[in-house]
């Protein structure tokens, strides 16, 4: 009798346990999700805690924010010069998303890796980019291009530094270098230039500059050397110092290619001018301090189709020896701007 009662109690407890389990399971159950899916597919994804780049185009392949920032850096350093900051094309073809997404990731990887006969470098097979970076860039150019910020007088003034005031600089040359025979050699990826004595073939100095110096220009007097990096940082180097070095610096934009100084009689070394790819503008500065004085935009209508262009990049700038003028070349609008600085407060700009 006792055995029967104990068996009955055990059975009732088992039924109670099963009932509670069923109720608990019902509380946790998700409609349309099987037990197998709950057990084997509900684990955390490694990407769950990674902040993703949010693209307004749903067809673009996924990228993390870190990948997007890496792609943006590579694009600026390697691609923007030919394809444009806004990716609308220049020397290279447009890389707008209507074209890149239609091409697809694998197609783009082939072009980035092997290049093309039209002049596209073989970034992958040359060793410049790793396989991972090639894949990253193929996905990056399928994202909507980020809108770069504008860069005005406020930003320039914040970056401006006079490291050696004019009053503390040499009043006469303090070295024996033949400044008419000095080479300024760009050390691209290290962000430096090397000054080479053309007479002795020895290195005078290696000077920290902006990224990938694009051009070095001598002042009319021969005393100052102006160098500008692709990141739009300008170094003013005094060649009269015992060891030539930077005496002033400024960043005039986000990407640039050109710098020049006034060379007309009576205005020698008075002004410096720099043109930027982004923002599309040129800036005139004090020649001996790089203090920014005036900014002029190059945005406007193209000469052929008379359409507004948001990114007319400033290419070369040349100073006239015969008139108080800078000749500024604006690429995408197809214009040459002759900037007369005789009356500086009322610049006369002639468009050709």
Which functions belong to the PLM regions below?
Residues 180-181, 221-223, 268-270, 323-324:
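Short coil/turn segments that connect the beta-strands within blades of beta-propeller domains
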Residues 64-85, 107-114:
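Sequence/structural segment immediately N-terminal to covalent heme-attachment motifs in c-type
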Residues 202-207, 245-250, 291-307, 345-352:
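A short beta-strand motif characteristic of beta-propeller blades
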Residues 40-74:
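Electrostatic cytochrome c docking/interface patches
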Residues 171-172, 212-218, 254-263, 303-318:
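Repeated scaffold domains used in trafficking and secretory/extracellular systems
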Residues 198-200, 239-242, 287-289, 341-344:
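Short loop/turn segments that connect beta-strands within beta-propeller blades
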Residues 159-220:
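Beta-strand-rich domains and repeat architectures in extracellular enzymes and scaffolds
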Residues 27-43, 86, 90, 96-146:
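Extracytoplasmic electron-transfer domains, predominantly the class I c-type cytochrome c fold
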């Amino acid at each position: 009798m006792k055995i029967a009662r104990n068996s009955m109690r055990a059975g009732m407890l088992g039924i109670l346990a099963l009932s509670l389990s069923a109720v608990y399971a019902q509380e946790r159950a998700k409609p349309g999700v099987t037990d197998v899916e709950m057990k084997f597919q509900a684990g955390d994804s490694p990407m769950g805690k990674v902040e993703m780049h949010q693209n307004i185009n749903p067809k673009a392949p996924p990228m993390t924010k870190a990948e997007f920032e890496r792609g943006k850096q590579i694009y600026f350093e390697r691609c923007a010069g030919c394809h444009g900051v806004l990716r609308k094309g220049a020397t290279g073809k447009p890389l707008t998303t209507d074209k890149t997404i239609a091409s697809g990731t694998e197609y783009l990887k082939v072009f980035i890796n092997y290049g093309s006969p039209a002049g596209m470098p073989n970034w992958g097979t040359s060793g410049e980019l790793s396989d991972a970076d090639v894949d990253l860039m193929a996905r990056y150019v399928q994202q909507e291009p980020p809108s770069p910020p504008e860069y005005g007088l406020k930003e320039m003034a914040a970056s401006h530094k006079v490291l050696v005031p004019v009053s503390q600089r040499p009043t006469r040359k303090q070295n024996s270098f033949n400044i008419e025979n000095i080479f300024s050699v760009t050390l691209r990826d290290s962000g430096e230039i090397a000054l080479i004595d053309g007479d002795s073939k020895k290195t005078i100095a290696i000077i920290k500059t902006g990224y990938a110096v694009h051009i070095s220009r001598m002042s009319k007097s021969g005393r100052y050397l102006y160098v500008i990096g692709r990141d739009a940082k300008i170094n003013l180097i005094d060649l009269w110092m015992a060891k030539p070095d930077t005496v002033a610096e400024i960043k005039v934009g986000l990407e640039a290619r050109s710098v020049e100084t006034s060379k007309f009689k009576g205005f020698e070394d008075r002004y410096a001018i720099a043109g930027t790819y982004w923002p599309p503008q040129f800036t005139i500065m004090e020649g001996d301090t790089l203090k920014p004085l005036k900014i002029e935009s190059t945005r406007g209508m193209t000469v052929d189709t008379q359409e507004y262009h948001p990114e007319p990049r400033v290419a070369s700038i040349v100073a006239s020896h015969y008139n108080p003028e800078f000749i500024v070349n604006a690429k995408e609008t197809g214009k040459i701007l002759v900037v007369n600085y005789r009356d500086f407060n009322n610049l006369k700009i002639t468009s050709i």
